[in-house]
Structures are given as structure tokens and as C-alpha cells.
């Protein structure tokens, strides 16, 4: 069995656990991710609850479908930031720390070293995202008041979409960082692309269907209809479901393939 795994260049459990441990040991990264996910959820719904308690006539309840959508916007935006930090760190962290050479000469397949970063990074990231969403989902129901209470189907769909969104940005950051070899460059480039470039391009009607190739536009298309307009960062652009799925798959697989290729061919 171990021979088969090695021949397929699949990462073993030890490699995956090692990747998770490397990420956990970065205290600064841990603080950023916790603040951008769990911290953001607590602060957002805490403020809404305090405002409602202080002036219920002016500020509505903190829960309901409406504020679930607002919460999804906050968590998808900050969760993607956390995903980019984790992906860039997983992809270029060994190079930055000067330990890539030691890993490359251990005899393990380089492709397995790269692929171990995918489940390792996702396990680290999605545990925080899931905890943050659990808080948001609970608050949207408990604090709904007179607002419409989210249905179980909506809560499940919104949670799955949030996990997908964060996992997608992690994959892009991991692949690009492995290709470029610079953590800071990738973080800066992807944050600028997601937070500045994408909203501008998505708001230009003259681009027409060309906007469908933007990752954020494709992700928005996959969001549950009840919160789609509220959770959008790149604007709601008409697109078919199949096109949106294809765009995300091509972006993720292309950058991951390039990242793995560079990891395998990089000079130690």
C-alpha cells in the first residue's frame, strides 16, 4: 500500500500533519486568521446586538436572513483574506525559511510535498471558517426577532458556499506562491486583485460576458439566492451556473498545476 501511495506521489498523513503543524506554529498567522474569521463574526453580530438593545426602534434585530447576508459578506471577504495569507504561507513558507533544500533531499517526491500543503492548509483554514460561520448561523436564528428566520436549507447552503469561497482563494494563493516563490508578493497581488481590481471590472457593463471569468463573479453566482446580493463583493453579474463552476475549476486547477510544476522543477 505504501508503495502505491509513493508511486502516485500522494502525501501521507505524516506530511499533512507536518504542514498543519508548521502553520499552527506561526503565531502571527494564527492571530490574523482567528481575527479575520471568529473575531470578525463575534464583533459583527456583537455590535448589531448592542445597537438593537440600545435603540430597538432605530436598529432592527441582529439576526434573520438580512443580517445573515451581511454576515456572509463580512466572513467571505475577511475569510478570503485569511485564505490568501495561509495559502501564500504554505506555498512559499519553506523557501522563505530556507528549509526547502532540506525537504527536497529527504527522498520524498516533491509533488507529494506540494500536495500535502493542500489538505494541510485547508484543515487549518476551514476549522476557523467553520467556527466563525457556526457563530453567524446561530446568531442569525437566535437574534432574528421579527425578521425572517433562515431555513435549515439556507443555513446549510450558505455555510457550504462560504467554505468553498475560502478554499478557492486558498488554492489560488497556494499555487501562485509556489510558482512565484514569494509570500509577500502573492499576498499583495491577490488582495489587490480581489479587493480593488475585481469590483472595478465587475462594475463595467461594457465588458459584458467577459466579466464572467472573474473568480469573485463566479463565486457570487454560486451563493444561495436569498443572500446573493448581500454577500457579493464583485457585483451580481448574470452568468450561468455551469459557466461559474467551470471558471472556478479552471482558475484553481491551473494555478495549482503551475505551483506543483514549479515545486518539482525548482532548483534546491
Description of each model-found segment:
Residues 2-9, 29-90, 114-183, 191-206, ...:
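Secretory targeting signals
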Residues 206-232:
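Short hydrophobic, aromatic-rich alpha-helical segments embedded in or entering the lipid bilayer
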Residues 12-24:
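A short amphipathic helical element positioned immediately N-terminal to and/or at the very start
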Residues 218-222, 245-254:
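Small-residue-rich transmembrane alpha-helices that serve as helix-helix interface/gating elements
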Residues 258-268:
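Membrane-interface capping segments at transmembrane-helix boundaries
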Residues 22, 92, 103-105, 173, ...:
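Helix-capping/transition residues at the boundaries of transmembrane alpha-helices
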Residues 84-106, 110-111, 118:
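Transmembrane helix boundary and interhelical loop/hinge segments in multi-pass membrane proteins
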Amino acid at each position: 500500500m505504501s508503495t502505491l501511495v509513493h508511486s502516485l506521489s500522494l502525501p501521507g498523513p505524516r506530511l499533512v500533519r507536518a504542514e498543519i503543524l508548521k502553520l499552527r506554529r506561526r503565531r502571527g498567522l494564527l492571530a490574523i486568521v482567528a481575527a479575520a474569521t471568529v473575531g470578525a463574526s463575534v464583533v459583527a453580530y456583537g455590535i448589531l446586538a448592542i445597537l438593537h438593545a440600545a435603540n430597538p426602534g432605530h436598529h432592527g434585530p441582529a439576526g434573520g436572513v438580512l443580517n445573515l447576508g451581511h454576515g456572509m459578506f463580512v466572513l467571505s471577504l475577511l475569510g478570503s483574506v485569511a485564505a490568501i495569507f495561509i495559502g501564500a504561507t504554505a506555498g512559499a513558507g519553506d523557501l522563505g525559511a530556507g528549509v526547502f533544500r532540506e525537504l527536497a533531499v529527504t527522498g520524498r517526491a516533491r509533488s507529494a510535498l506540494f500536495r500535502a500543503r493542500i489538505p494541510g492548509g485547508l484543515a487549518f483554514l476551514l476549522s476557523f471558517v467553520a467556527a466563525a460561520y457556526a457563530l453567524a448561523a446561530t446568531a442569525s436564528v437566535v437574534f432574528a426577532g421579527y425578521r425572517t428566520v433562515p431555513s435549515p436549507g439556507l443555513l446549510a447552503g450558505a455555510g457550504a458556499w462560504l467554505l468553498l469561497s475560502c478554499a478557492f482563494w486558498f488554492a489560488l494563493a497556494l499555487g501562485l506562491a509556489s510558482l512565484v516563490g514569494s509570500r509577500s508578493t502573492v499576498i499583495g497581488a491577490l488582495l489587490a486583485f480581489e479587493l480593488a481590481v475585481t469590483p472595478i471590472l465587475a462594475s463595467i457593463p461594457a465588458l459584458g460576458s467577459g466579466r464572467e471569468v472573474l473568480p469573485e463573479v463566479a463565486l457570487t453566482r454560486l451563493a444561495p439566492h436569498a443572500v446573493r446580493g448581500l454577500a457579493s463583493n464583485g457585483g451580481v453579474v448574470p452568468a450561468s451556473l455551469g459557466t461559474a463552476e467551470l471558471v472556478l475549476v479552471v482558475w484553481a486547477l491551473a494555478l495549482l498545476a503551475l505551483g506543483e510544476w514549479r515545486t518539482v522543477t525548482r532548483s534546491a
